[in-house]
Amino acid sequence: MPSTHDMDKIATLSDWSEYVGVNNERDYVTAYPLDECPYYVVAKTWYADEMHRPGCVWTHSLLIHKDDLLKITDFCNLLYLFEEPLTENYENYSTPRPFIEDAKETETQLSEIGENRAAEVYECLLSSTPSFILSEFTSRHSQELLLSLLNYVPVEILKNKSICSGTASPRSYDGQYLSLQLVTHDGNAVKYLSNKPAAPSSQLVGVSVVNNRPQVSSLIRHYQDELGDSVEKLSGFLNVVVLINRTCKDDEEKQQVLLEIINTLSETFPAKEDGRIFKSAVFQPSLARDLGGEENFLFTISTVDVSSFTKEQVDYEKRLRELTTAQFLQLLKQLYTTWKLNEWGIQTVNEVAQYVSYAEIADLRETDKTFFQTIICSSPELLNQILWSDFTKEEIQSTLSLFSDKDMAKAFKHWRELFKTMLNQKVPIASELARMAFSHDRTCVEEYLNYLNSEKHQPHRPVSRELERYPEAVVDWLSKRDSINWDVAYVLVNSIDEFSPWVKNRGSRIWMPLHNMLSEKDPIQFYIYLYRLSFNWQDKEALVYLRKAFYPIHELLVQDKLEYYLWYRIEPYTEHLFFWQNFDKCKKLRKMVVRRLKEAGCSKLALMNYTPDKQTNEWLLKEW
């Protein structure tokens, strides 16, 4: 031993503790770490009756490298290695002893100690302050109890723990008391065992020790790297094991236990990477089966604080995908009814399409309309799988509110199909919805104009008004038509600026359908629009539009029935006269017609039958 300090510690703690047991036994075990060398000492001491000098003892010390402590699954198995000197041959005591795990002498018999007292001693062992307990047990029971309890201490904690199974008074070295000592003499600091139930975590150890159940100690050793040197983590770990093994009488208790397990894990291992392996083991599907089923587990983990967990530890997304459609929908229904979804639950609700298809929820349209609408409203992907032509008018109307969400409207890809179905089924279309449809898919403009130009159409004035925002799309549609009806003409006249670049650049010919559909019964506004429109070009069609519009406008001027706001629209496109003639609106209009015909290279003969009225034609000829 290279350290004189450690040699002195071994020598000091090998001295007789003056222990005399309940049956006058005088053998006991001591275990403690060395301070400078990497060894943990487990020693057994016998009183040397054969010595003439009082107080002599034999102490057999086993030096176990601290890195090898994890290899010892049961410290009671060390007892068979200790050998009381019965001869004068002491060479065996300086020779390493082979440790054979299965070679222990007998099973421990600790039932006489009782589960409660074993649990209380365990709590004292883990205490941060030294504990002195009045010994009530035989020497053998004391040794087996303390060595058995060492099996339930993670190695990193054990490296700083020391015990003595028998001493007359508390023992210390270098001013430091051993962690746990069973003492035979009463004193102010000596603790009496109460035999009352301890905390659940300690009680679990007490039951395991007394009944020779090594499973819990095996678990502690398996996860000892995650427990480290933290007594708090060990306590939380054991509490989780207690909860997992609790027998629940009903679903309410199962739910409570599940919440306690999750909360205990969070408190014990608050960081995501703390206890990572243990968390994954706890969250295995077997836990869910025992505590309310997989859907209930996934619902619970979607509503609690999950800042201490990762989805990988829970296998969250994999387990969602492994649910049957019925199971997932049941879970989803629960998620929709709670207000305390965490980020996992919110993501699940927002990404429903990853777990079910539209075909799998289509039947809900008949069986649970509200639930169906809720699913669709939370999933753009499923919304995009809808065949809108299958929807009734009422179903469409109840779905439209979801488009008030800008993100949902942006993600929707089938505006034209929806818009067409709404038109065909005569679903009222608000201007806001029309604006969204036109802005997200310009082909909806074409769809609306096609519908409006059909025989069985029903005008939607709010929709028509929105078309003024899309003159290019309207003009493009018109360029592909040979004829239009009155309602389309109304849209053109009231929505399209006749002098916009899109109108001018597409040429005059595309406006012939508007010219052709006008009759004497049509509003004068249509003719004024056509009149103004003709000023965009100097070609044949422009003169045709001019001629068509001139006569109805002129007739109203002759009768002084053209309202001023309408005259205001055409006056800039009439001839400017001398101030003493400028009051004559009819003359101003006729002069402009004549001027345009002259500019186009037409002869005076073009005015002979320019209008159906002979008098008007004569006036025109005079203006030439």
Positions of PLM-derived features:
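Extended, helix-rich scaffolding/adaptor regions
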Residues: 1-102, 120, 141, 157-163, ...
